Amino acid sequence: MKASILSKLESLVERYEEVQHLLGDPTVIGDQNKFRALSKEYSQLEEITQCFQAYQQAKEDLVAAEEMAQEDDAEMREMAQDEIKAAKAAIERLTDELQILLLPKDPNDDRNCFLEIRAGAGGDEAGIFAGDLFRMYSRFAEKKGWRIEVMSSSEAEHGGYKEMIAKVNGDGAYGTLKFESGGHRVQRVPATEAQGRIHTSACTVAVMPEIPEAEIPEIKASDLKIDTFRSSGAGGQHVNTTDSAIRITHLPTGIVVECQDERSQHKNKAKAMSVLAARIAQAEESKRAAEISDTRRNLLGSGDRSDRIRTYNYPQGRVSDHRINLTVYRLTEVMEGDMQSLIDPVIHEHQADQLAALADQN
């Protein structure tokens, strides 16, 4: 391992011990904001500290085993060779783990996120598939102990949704789901298909981090066009007799957000503004990323329908991720929310790309 990396790790361990000491300080315990911030830092440093300590122990084990290999006793020398092999394997594994733990963290990864699903090409079947995707993500969220909150929805005529915007509340929601952005294609025989022909339809998914209230940039009132209208669809008689639905247009960017799920116009406006802030921030981030993009691939989808990331093939029971050439024959389980086998390989590939980029810089 490079001396610069070892030095960085040693300084992180020092900081971990310092934070550990501070958390026992009565003045810190009495300051809830400071205590909360230090507790978060402590938990972030704990994993890398434990990993580095295990790495140091493996190095010590290797030295001890190499010394044992010099013994006169043949049985001891044979035992030492096994220990040398085990220590070297541990050092290699822990080195890889430490490099990943040292990768720059996306500050948004720990945040809640907005999940937008839109029916694309494929008519009624695309709307039904949008409903299937929302159910899949909802089941996955349940397994993670997260909470799904519908922000806005537009139901399709024959089931499912034309559009669904939901907020996913939970630690690490954005970091886990951010690679879901892009085009999702389904191949299956629709229930209404008498000839048994396979149809292809598509949906687009966009995942955006929630912007905390304190960090929302000021949006000028003059930049907004706010329309109220009567809610359509589910919600009961009361909803349909008042202009409770809200449509907000951000004039400088042309971004439009509608919200009609709440009975209260005030609540609909608050929800729409939070989605609008996330969309504006995402548009700015996409622009920044495009300006500094290089020849490296970007596994983070754009949410554009042309950016196809995954195919769900029902006749073959398979799901394929086109970004990393991954195919799993577990379609039923995936649609029931068992998505980790699809999510983890993309995250690992992204980390490998980050490591390659760092290697090029050094």
From Swiss-Prot:
Post-translational modification, as annotated: Methylated by PrmC. Methylation increases the termination efficiency of RF1.
SMART domains per UniProt: PCRF (SM00937)
Keywords annotated in UniProt: Cytoplasm, Methylation, Protein biosynthesis
Residues where N5-methylglutamine is found: 237
Domain of life: Bacteria
Database matches in Pfam families: PCRF (PF03462), RF-1 (PF00472)
Keyword Secreted on entry: no
Molecular functions (GO terms): translation release factor activity, codon specific
Family: Belongs to the prokaryotic/mitochondrial release factor family.
Stated name of the protein: Peptide chain release factor 1
Organism: Vibrio cholerae serotype O1 (strain ATCC 39315 / El Tor Inaba N16961)
